[in-house]
Amino acid sequence: MTSDPTSSTAFVFAGGGSLGAIEVGMLRELVASGERPDCVVGASSGAINAAYFAGRPDADGVAMLAALWCRIRRQDIMPFSMRSLVAMLLRNRPHLVEADALRLLLERNLPYRRIEQAALPLHIVATDVLSGQEVVLSAGPVVDAVQASAAIPGVFPSVSIGGVELVDGGVANNTPISVAIALGVRRIVVLPAGFACALRVPPRSAIAHATHALTLVIARQLVRDLELYGARAQIHVVPPLCPLEVSSYDYSQCAQLIDKAAERTRAWIDAGGLAECVIPGQLREHHHAAALSH
């Protein structure tokens, strides 16, 4: 971070499952417009974007991150099978699948091994599974930190770091604006994944249903945080895609999400979005399905 925190900028990446691809489109246009953060903060799936961008914070790095998202399939993140379900039941284990696939994905693609080796100061948020308290990881093995931050309770196993069992950062603080403020940052650009506000029918699988519900909670909490911290920092929130029909469990449309988010973000920047500190209406409770059906 720069020596003068009052003039520094943080990018804050929220969680949102597969909708994390939207943040990559936002990031592409922010970087193209000349935005250069002094640090990055991320939680849950946003920790993946934060960690990758911190390692290569330029247009080429964003392009490589976009290519990664376009290659990801759900089985690369959550390799569910009847075998994994039976194993959970028979072995009485507290998670559905092992995180080997996610860990391998991170090890193959992150260009550094320790958080302190990143080109930008990186702060990853996880949750103490016993106390529910937020844990900010600013040093140590980056793969462990990201894996912990993305460890959805009940789906993935917790990750032990420093003797503390950690799970998804979204449980404690999914859009960690407060972390950036505690670091002394006074200008924050928030990249929210948003939520599927135009689903015509509820998600069919249990996991898809749960992740969609979480994105609704995330958006509501983000609005509250923006209202709470708005007087303590200059906070710019990139509007998420709206209307959006893609579930946070659907990894088949990442390329389209990236391109559409980039287009919308460019229009927002051109309209002076980075000069305003407002809460986008797209984050507030709403639904479009009824309107789209006509």
Where are these regions (language model features)?
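Catalytic domains of lipid- and phosphate-ester/thioester hydrolases
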Residues: 1-38, 49-55, 63-66, 185-188, ...
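Patatin-like phospholipase
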Residues: 4-102, 106, 138-148, 192, ...
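Amphipathic repeat-derived elements
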Residues: 13-21, 27, 40, 150-169, ...
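Intrinsic-disorder/low-complexity, polar/charged segments
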Residues: 18, 114, 202-209, 250, ...
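Short alpha-helical interface patches
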Residues: 48, 115-118, 213
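Short, basic, helix/turn surface patches
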Residues: 65-76, 213-226
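Active-site-adjacent alpha/beta core region of enzyme catalytic domains
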Residues: 78-196, 228-279
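Short acidic, glycine/proline-enriched helix-loop-strand junctions
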Residues: 197-222, 231-236
